[in-house]
UniProtKB/Swiss-Prot annotation:
PANTHER family recorded: TETRAACYLDISACCHARIDE 4'-KINASE, TETRAACYLDISACCHARIDE 4'-KINASE, MITOCHONDRIAL-RELATED
Binding residues for ATP: A59, I60, G61, G62, T63, G64, K65, T66
Organism whose genome encodes this protein: Saccharophagus degradans (strain 2-40 / ATCC 43961 / DSM 17024)
Entry GO MF terms: ATP binding; tetraacyldisaccharide 4'-kinase activity
Keyword Lipid biosynthesis: yes
UniProt protein name: Tetraacyldisaccharide 4'-kinase
Length: 361
């Protein structure tokens, strides 16, 4: 699929479906297949010696899973709870069913950009592999952890789970609300009724709550003939990404984001699930006169990608920066972000994790 076509489809996903309505029969088939897949895999799911908490979503695209995982690992560590992380490792050079546990020699090409970023920011044990069950088993053979956090994997039902945290992009929410390929959803929104937490990344509470109320009305109508199955989606918890500085990829020098004009002319580059969010972060400094360049999520950057930006500073995401380290120059800067979680949520999350851990001891 060409980049232009992919962008055109994505625009329809987050507006009115338009011509994509022609694919509605495929969306119905996708929903049916998803139902049977979930039912089949759940019956044969694998449990482990420690609890598993899924951190995922029901929509395609960036919802902030990586900064969320990082924040949760730190929050658990402050409570004396050791977490390990398993991830798919998109873009990693892994053979089928191969699992790799990250170490100091890991590179983005070996293990994927997101797992490497999690490892660098937290220092926790991270195992990557397309088979998350095998990843958990490998992790537990070599490391003692109290709980495993799965970066994504909500639809990987072979992986037994004790708790689930669903992430929602507070600006895009559920897009047009339709399943693939008409919309961006991997599962029907009523799936959110079975998760433990609904964490909203950014956006306004008014906008998100309005969408959630509409969702509840749709779910209630669909399940009106099955009153015993009527559940409510968990109350949303709102979190915000915070960016305060830039870091030079070659030297480690830091610069406050509010002083970004000191870079002179610069371009912004992003190869993430939702590049617009990153560009808006930079625009929040009041600077708007810079060019933006979007690449597909998990894009494998090379030095050739940056030759067109001679004589300009290059500002990128931290996720992209871990892939550019081998050819870093003084012109390259990245913006680390931290997810600021409400203290009430952190307390509840850690308490629920501790409660489940007790059941395994």
């Amino acid at each position: 699929m060409s980049a232009a076509l992919a962008k055109a489809i994505e625009r329809r996903w987050y507006s009115r479906p338009g011509i994509l309505w022609l694919l509605y029969p495929l969306a119905l088939l996708f929903r049916l297949l998803s139902y049977f897949r979930r039912r089949s895999q759940t019956q044969s799911s694998v449990k482990f010696a420690v609890p598993v908490c899924i951190v995922g979503n029901i929509a395609i695209g960036g919802t902030g899973k990586t900064p969320t995982i990082i924040a949760l690992v730190h929050a658990l560590a402050e409570q004396g709870i050791t977490a390990g992380v398993v991830a798919r490792g998109y873009g990693a050079s892994l053979a089928k069913d191969e699992v790799r546990v990250l170490d100091a020699n890991a590179t983005a090409a070996m293990v994927g950009d997101e797992p490497l970023l999690i490892y660098k920011r937290t220092g926790c044990v991270v195992a990557v592999g397309s088979n998350r069950v095998a990843a958990c088993e490998t992790l537990l053979k070599s490391h003692a952890v109290d709980v495993i956090l799965s970066d994504d994997g909500m639809q990987h039902y072979k992986l037994g789970r004790d708790l689930e945290l669903a992430l929602v992009d507070g600006e895009r929410v559920f897009g047009n609300g339709q399943l693939l390929p008409v919309g961006p959803l991997r599962e029907h929104p009523k799936r959110l009724q079975s998760v433990n937490w609904l964490l909203v990344n950014g956006g306004s509470a008014e906008h998100v709550n309005a969408r959630l109320q509409a969702l509840e009305a749709i779910n209630a109508a669909e399940l009106s003939s099955k009153p015993n199955k009527l559940n409510k989606t968990p109350a949303p918890v709102f979190a915000q990404l915070e960016a305060v500085k830039l870091v030079n990829l070659a030297t480690g020098k830091t610069l406050l984001l509010q002083n970004i004009t000191e870079l002179g002319a610069f371009v912004a580059v992003a190869g993430i699930g939702n590049p617009a969010r990153f560009f808006k972060t930079l625009q929040s400094t009041g600077i708007t006169g810079f060019d933006t360049f979007s690449y597909p999520d998990h894009h494998k950057f090379t030095s050739a990608d940056f030759r067109q930006f001679d004589n300009k500073a290059i500002v990128m995401t931290e996720k992209d920066a871990v892939k550019c380290t081998p050819f870093a120059t003084d012109a390259m800067w990245y913006v680390p972000v931290d997810l600021k979680l409400p203290q009430t949520f952190i307390a509840d999350f850690c308490a629920q994790i501790r409660k489940v851990i007790a059941l395994y001891n």
